[in-house]
Amino acid sequence: AHFAGSSDPVRVLDVGCGGGFLSNHLSKEGFEVDGLDASADSLAVAAQHDPTGNVRYTRGDALSLPFADESFDVVCAMDFLEHVEAPARVVAEAGRVLRPRGLFFFHTFNRNPLAWLVVIKGVEWFVKNTPKDMHVLRLFIRPAELRGMCEASGLKVVELHGSAPVVGSLAFWKMLATRVVPRDFRFRFAKSTRIAYTGFAERLPSGDSNV
């Protein structure tokens, strides 16, 4: 609905696209998608599973995106910001490549003892062969910190919700039984942001106030 008045295809950048789950899904839905990741192996997997053959996969650095200013309608950073040392630079780059009124979508983890217990220790226990230091608590981001990063980058947070796994679903029980996270594992909105949160921000036109 946000882009309903435009006849041009909505151009989406998926930052830290990994194996392409989101990029490939969005391409199937008719969006014009670019996926960026630092891992050549992940990009190869993503391209192999792209049913449309239309996603443009690029190996690159999220801290210095290889794209022109104001070239995307949407930028996604889903489960990515908590893996980088300088998330503020990633957010700033998202703001740079977004067109005015473009949207920045995010999902990440809060930084507190409960998030450490659930996201780090819980995942290590539930999911076998979890890579060492897959998540590091000091890299987790408090909601107020992410709001500040957005404001400094010309982005206004429009919505921010807590996020929690869908407990009791078939995918949840499959994970418990196999200790492998299935592809259909899902999160839902939650009242609390203590563990994880998701939302989106809008790129303000030049000269607009962020208050």
Predicted regions and their residues:
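A C-terminal cap/extension of S-adenosyl-L-methionine-dependent methyltransferases
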Residues: 126, 148, 152, 157-211
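Conserved class I S-adenosyl-L-methionine
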Residues: 104-128
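A short glycine-rich, Lys/Arg-flanked "PGG" loop and its adjoining helix->strand segment in the class I
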Residues: 88-100
